Amino acid sequence: MSTTAAESWSTLQSASSSTAVGSALNNEQSLRATGKGSPFVQSNLRLFNSSEKPKITLYRDHAGWCPYCQKTMLLIEEKEIPINIELVAMRSYGDKPAEFLNMVPSGLLPALIVEQPDGRKRVITESQVIMELLDRWHPTSEGYKAMLPSEEDTVGWSKFDTLANLERELFSWWCTLVFRPEGPRLGGGSGGLMGMLTGKGGGEKEMSGSMKGFLDCLSKVESALTSTPGPWFFGEYDYPTMIDFIYVSHVERMLASAAYWKGLDLRSAEYKAQFPGLNAWLDAFEKRECYLAFKSDYYTHVMDIPPQYGPGFDGGFEDKRKEFSQCINGRDGKSWKLPLPHDDPVQPLYRGPPLPLCALSAAGIESDADGTYESTNPEQMAKACRHMAGWKLSSNGDKVARFAARGGVDGAKNPRKSFGAPLADPYANPDQSVVPSVDAVLRIVCAALLEDGE
C-alpha cells in the first residue's frame, strides 16, 4: 500500500491539538509536567500545592498493573503527598535498572527512597509499611487527610486490624478459586457431588467449595461495609482511607478474573442485590478521578494477571463464563465490532467519568446529578472518546507502529532471555519490512479518529 497518502504524524498532532479535547489534554499534560494537574498513571512528579522539591521518591511499575503500587498511589493521590516517582518494569515485563537493584536488591515494588539529612538514602519496601509511614509523616496537623485511626483510638485500630486480616482471607479465597482447579460442586442437585456420582449432568445452582468460600468471605466484607452510614469502611470520613485502598486494588482484579474464568459477575443485578454495600463502595470509587487514573479494564487485567499470579482455571458457572470471556476477548461478534456499542454489558463505562474531567469539560459533557454519565448523549461521548484516542495515538504513533510490527513474519523474538509476559518483551525487534505499512495504516486510523463526522 502507499505509505505517503496518509498525513504525517506531525500534521496529525497539529490536527489533534486543534480539537477542544486535544487542546485541553495538551494543557493538562503541561500541568502534570510541573507536578500539578490531574492524576495520571505515568506521572513522574506530584507536588499538588507544594512548591518544594520532595525528598521522597516512590519506585513503582509503569502501567499501574501492580496492585501494591496501585494502592500506594491511591493513598498518595487522596492525601495529596508531594513525591517524586520513578517508573520501573515489573519482573514479568523486562529488566530492572541496575541503579534500582543497587538500592533494592530484591527488586520489590513498590519501594520508597527517603533522603536523609546526612545525605544517605533509606530504602523502604512493602506497600502497607510505606502507606503507614506516609500517613504518619504527613499528619492532619499539617493539613493532610487522615488515612488511619489516631494513636489513641484503640477501637479504630482494632477495626482496622480486623478488616486487614479479612482482606488477606478474601485474597486467599480468590487465589483458591481462580488459580487452582475447582473441586466438585457442593449440593445434592444434578450439578453437585451427587450428580457427579450418579453421572447426571448439571445445572448452575450448585457451586464448588472454593466458589462458596469466596462468596461467603465476600459476605463478611459486605457486612463491614453496610455497618457504616457511607460507602467507605470507616464511616466517619467522607473519603476513602487506607483500608479502602488495601482492598480495592485486588477487588478490582477479582471482578475481572471472576467474570472471565468463573462466569461470576459481581456487578450484575443479581449480585448487586446480594452485595449492595460492595457495589455502592465500588460505585463511589468509580466517581473519583484519582481511582480511575489507575483503574484497568477487564481485558487488561485478564492479560496482566497470569504473568503475576499464574494461569487462571476455567470453571464456575459455565454458560456465563463463556459469555463473559467472549465479550472480554472481543469474540462475541459485538464488543469489538464497528460501530462500537455505546456501553459494555460486563463493565459499564459511565458509572463515573469515562475520560479525564478536563476532556469531558472541553467536550461540553456534564455529569448527571448522581455523578454518573449514563444519560450523556452517546454521539457526543463517542466523539470525545475518538478525539482523545486520536490525541494519544498522534503523540506516540511511530513507536506504536514499531511495537505492532514485531508481529510481522520477520519480527525477532529475544534470543537471550524470556519474560513472563512475552508480548511485552522489550528486546523483541520489529519486522522492518512491514513498519512503513503499519505506520501508514495507523496514520489513517488516527485521521479517522480526529474527524468531526461520525
Model-predicted regions and their roles:
Residues 201-208, 259-273:
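Acidic, serine/threonine/proline-rich low-complexity intrinsically disordered regions
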Residues 230-231, 281-283, 292:
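C-terminal and inter-domain tail/linker signature
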Residues 237-262, 285:
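GST superfamily/GST-like fold recognition
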Residues 293-295, 326:
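Acidic catalytic cores of enzymes that act on phosphate-bearing nucleotides/polynucleotides
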